[in-house]
Amino acid sequence: MRKKLTALVLSALPLAAVADVSLYGEIKAGVEGRNYQLQLTEAQAANGGASGQVKVTKVTKAKSRIRTKISDFGSFIGFKGSEDLGDGLKAVWQLEQDVSVAGGGATQWGNRESFIGLAGEFGTLRAGRVANQFDDASQAIDPWDSNNDVASQLGIFKRHDDMPVSVRYDSPEFSGFSGSVQFVPIQNSKSAYTPAYYTKDTNNNLTLVPAVVGKPGSDVYYAGLNYKNGGFAGNYAFKYARHANVGRNAFELFLIGSGSDQAKGTDPLKNHQVHRLTGGYEEGGLNLALAAQLDLSENGDKTKNSTTEIAATASYRFGNAVPRISYAHGFDFIERGKKGENTSYDQIIAGVDYDFSKRTSAIVSGAWLKRNTGIGNYTQINAASVGLRHKF
């Protein structure tokens, strides 16, 4: 009897040691369909008889077939915990991992927000892969679940959301206000990258120029200020990098769905800074969120680039159903000091979540995104999805 009791106590010790560890995550997947439309307008020269050359406009339109597939909508699993170190000090840690019920996907542990740190009356200090201040505020403005982060989520607006390998400090709350600062060392910032391309000689022979991976850009700095009072919440997020690897080319690549760090680093810039202001209001079943974003940078020749965008999301709960709509608009961008004519974008996402329980919901959405790429030119994406989400 004594041996059995001893064995029982010993077997319970590991469980007691990890009693403060929480397992959590989301499993979500469904069916998605999308198609692309584009229009290209070209000015061509044609013979005009005695009058000489006459300019002729050629308009080309194209449309893809509807592509439908079963996709994972961003499933993940996480572990987090803490340990009381005494005198109000705690050790905190978290490990998150992307998973996919559709097969494939990321295989490295800790590819989502994962860190270790200390928390106390002074605030919280964390090191690891930590979400930045832009990512903090995005849930309010973009609560959509989808595999298509460009059209079925506000992917262009959220292109600065990141979980960089960094150190971050969050202050305690004072009268509704709190702040944070974050630092990404140069060796942890994304590398500069020039994609492969073809050149043509005088005989029209094509030569492939291979891709070139350069050195890291520079240290990256983030800061944030939050305010919460009753149903109102506000957030300001800031980013600065002296040498950045995100520019207009990255903007284009993100539009067509490229998600790699290398693809995001095609246009090295200087003095890159981003400002985003987000405000939200929640009362009963009503949720409203508004956001504005300004992206500024310089080129090697001292000319300047900028993009200005706005986004809004509204939802209201009717029993188990939560209909929702989002809208985003990007104004004509400025490149090398000159305004790009007809370079804006517009995006609308509408859908509904239906809660079967507190943890399981059906999710339905439809999306439309139109990106103007010059006078008479545009790319349009139409998408729809139906899926199921379970939280644990």
Curated annotation (Swiss-Prot):
The protein's UniProt keywords, in alphabetical order, are: Cell outer membrane, Ion transport, Membrane, Porin, Signal, Transmembrane, Transmembrane beta strand, Transport
Q: Which Gene3D superfamilies match?
A: Porin
Which superkingdom, per the lineage?
Bacteria
Please give the InterPro entries that the UniProt record associates with this protein.
Answer: Gram-neg_bact_OMP, Gram_neg_porin_domain, Porin_dom_sf, Porin_Gram-ve, Porin_Gram-ve_CS, Porin_Neis
Q: How does it sit in the membrane?
A: Multi-pass membrane protein
Q: Which residues cross the membrane?
A: none
Q: Where is the signal peptide?
A: 1-19
What is a single cellular component term in the Gene Ontology annotation? pore complex
UniProt GO MF annotations: porin activity
Q: Name one Pfam family in it.
A: Porin_1
Its subcellular locations are:
Cell outer membrane
Instruction: List the GO biological process terms.
Output: monoatomic ion transmembrane transport
**Which family does this protein fall into?**
Belongs to the Gram-negative porin family.
The function of this protein is: Serves as a slightly cation selective porin. Major antigen on the gonococcal cell surface and it may have pathogenic properties in addition to its porin activity.
> Subunit notes for this chain?
Homotrimer.
Please identify the protein, giving its name as recorded: Major outer membrane protein P.IA
Which organism does this sequence originate in?
Neisseria meningitidis serogroup B / serotype 15 (strain H44/76)
